[in-house]
Regions:
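A short glycine-rich, Lys/Arg-flanked "PGG" loop and its adjoining helix->strand segment in the class I
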Residues: 121-134
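Short helix-loop-beta connector
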Residues: 40-46
Length: 145
């Protein structure tokens, strides 16, 4: 029995607008996460959303007046296409851990991403050691239904 690559599944979801349900399904959790971390950040702050999908969290972060830069990364080509179509910002198509940002970030946000990795602990080490600014914050959510 073979398993399908998650990026292929999410590209299919984007094509049939199922990505919109991701926002409605995760908004409550993401809002709680952001309510915790935003007050902890220096001003202005930079942020990256790892597994950004259609970019809805990036758009939410851009709405904070003290947010100076937002980057999104996702492995689904169709999700990145939607992110670019729906908003302004910097979006990258790549699977991880094979991509590295050109700068470090004050906030690393991730929702429903880590369990798709073969080595999530290794990715967390990379995020902390290579992507996160000193005194930065990483927050990752995994919904449990």
């Amino acid at each position: 029995m073979s398993t399908r690559d998650a990026t292929d599944v999410f590209s299919e979801w984007a094509l049939i607008d199922r990505d919109e349900g991701m926002e409605s399904g995760h908004a409550k959790s993401v809002n709680e996460m952001l309510n915790i971390v935003i007050p902890m950040l220096k001003k202005p702050f930079s942020a990256i959303d790892v597994g950004c999908g259609n970019g809805w969290v990036c758009r939410k972060l851009q709405a904070y007046e003290n947010c100076s830069k937002v980057v999104g990364i996702d492995g689904s080509s169709e999700m990145i296409a939607k992110a670019k179509q729906k908003g302004t910002g910097e979006f990258h198509l790549s699977t991880l851990p094979g991509w590295k940002p050109s700068q470090k970030f004050d906030l690393i946000h991730s929702m429903e991403f880590l369990y798709y990795l073969k080595e999530p602990l290794e990715m967390l080490k990379i995020l902390f050691n290579e992507w996160l600014e000193d005194q930065g914050v990483l927050i990752a959510g995994v919904d449990h239904y």
